[in-house]
């Protein structure tokens, strides 16, 4: 019970925090100076663990971020990390996802996929597109990127 209440409180704080960001962003196109330094790339890591809506929203978020950052002349580094059941939908046989992944890759997005998730979901690593790097753990990759200064973006 305590864990559920804690989760609900944390989620409420995040929702309230994000709702105020959009109002601020509308007033200040420089996002409070976040993008002021042109020499440092904007670093984003996105975690995707579910197929369907979360996967689609994460891809759209990356595309929109790239479009905005390029229009402002900003450098960026974006990595999408796949873990959990979504790995079943990232094999070479899923051509609809591969087209979108290749498009984002052409824009400089890098992809990582959890070896743990591949094993737990019965996916042969040989069936993963060559441009998606297999890593031991998706969760640990996200933690590493956060430590390296990346902003964590997750679609729910």
How should each PLM-predicted stretch be described?
Residues 26-77:
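N-terminal secretory signal peptides
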Residues 21-25:
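Sec/Tat signal peptide C-region and signal peptidase I cleavage site
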Residues 1-10:
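Bacterial N-terminal signal peptides that target proteins for export
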Residues 43-47, 79-82, 110-113:
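Structural recognition of the beta-strand scaffold that forms the well-ordered cores
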